[in-house]
Swiss-Prot record:
It is an enzyme of class 7 (translocase). The gene is nuoD. Its EC number is 7.1.1.-. This is NADH-quinone oxidoreductase subunit D. Belongs to the complex I 49 kDa subunit family. Keywords: Cell inner membrane, Cell membrane, Membrane, NAD, Quinone, Translocase, Transport, Ubiquinone. SUPFAM superfamilies: HydB/Nqo4-like. It catalyses: a quinone + NADH + 5 H(+)(in) = a quinol + NAD(+) + 4 H(+)(out). NDH-1 is composed of 14 different subunits. Subunits NuoB, C, D, E, F, and G constitute the peripheral sector of the complex. Disulfide bonds: none annotated. GO terms for cellular component: plasma membrane. Pfam families: Complex1_49kDa (PF00346). It is a peripheral membrane protein.
Amino acid sequence: MAEIKNYTLNFGPQHPAAHGVLRLVLELDGEVIQRADPHIGLLHRATEKLAENKTFIQSVPYMDRLDYVSMMVNEHGYVLAIEKLLGIEVPERAQYIRVLFDEITRVLNHLMWIGAHALDVGAMAVFLYAFREREDLMDVYEAVSGARMHAAYYRPGGVYRDLPEAMPQYKASKIRNERALAKMNEARSGSVLDFIDDFFTRFPKCVDEYETLLTDNRIWKQRLVGIGVVSPERALQLGLTGPMIRGSGIAWDLRKKQPYEVYDRLDFDIPVGVNGDCYDRYLVRVEEMRQSTRIAKQCIEWLRKNPGPVITDNHKVAPPSRVGMKTNMEDLIHHFKLFTEGFHVPEGETYAAVEHPKGEFGIYLVSDGANKPYRLKIRAPGYAHLSALDEMARGHMIADAVTIIGTQDIVFGEIDR
């Protein structure tokens, strides 16, 4: 009898569900996946090498472009590594602002994930709902940094500036009447902090809407339950982190286990799954959005009561004020040195990790005492998750591969870097 060969199929990189530039070579028996071979490197931009030729502060915007839906959290890992080597203290207000924006970024990421994941599986409505809320948070990004995506807001020693007192408002146009305009600007009449507070007050109801559409939906459960199961032991061996390992029942979260900034002062829970399948990972991420709301509310309350500096007063690391520069020669010299040569970081090596929306995002930084990193190694969570795809997809249908890629929450900016 003739031997039947397995069928080989290329999935991506021009595939709408490939999340960027993923190329999978699938070995199929009928429609069942026997092997999934991910081919990466199509979005490689040599970020680590570029960082070796730029001063420490010039590399902050490169971090935004790694995982381009979780911009500020990438910056956070990088500035933490620099601060560790410099041994500088970050003002308390700056730490709270960082934590607040980490959680805003987490919500931004999970909204993008739930919208794209649902769209891949075939649910169109959730995508539109999620982007309605993302728009408000993008406006917050724009209000503090001037950019909707690549903010470059965090700095070694603090943040670029304090939260502005006024929130940008919608302007009158031909397509909006007075009443519609007044309604749109209702929440924007106060400060940026007021706007964030208003957003997180109404956000839990929005999460309820997503859950109404998906959680008990028959088709959603048929597509997710029992798909891509990873046991707790295997999750540890594969190096999974973030919602991927928590979905398998392991309560590992750097915000609790290795607290950084002010996370040890905040009250929140770690959602954990039971079965380790796509459905549990979905539930974990939805609950994470609720926990981020809790954290953000606590940060807002603290920030209202405690004004103060938002960046270190060490002018060898952070620029002096404009007023100081115009009156004080020393400040002018500091400013000039900072933006031409940059600051020198003491010799040594360090690893700083943050709880990124996708998992553990780590920066391994080696300094030889110069004004540039000697070596910068990025530990991207998606890289470990993608390497587990072959194991997770075996024995499933082609359509389930799309579900598994969606549940891994893959963004190629950080995998290929």
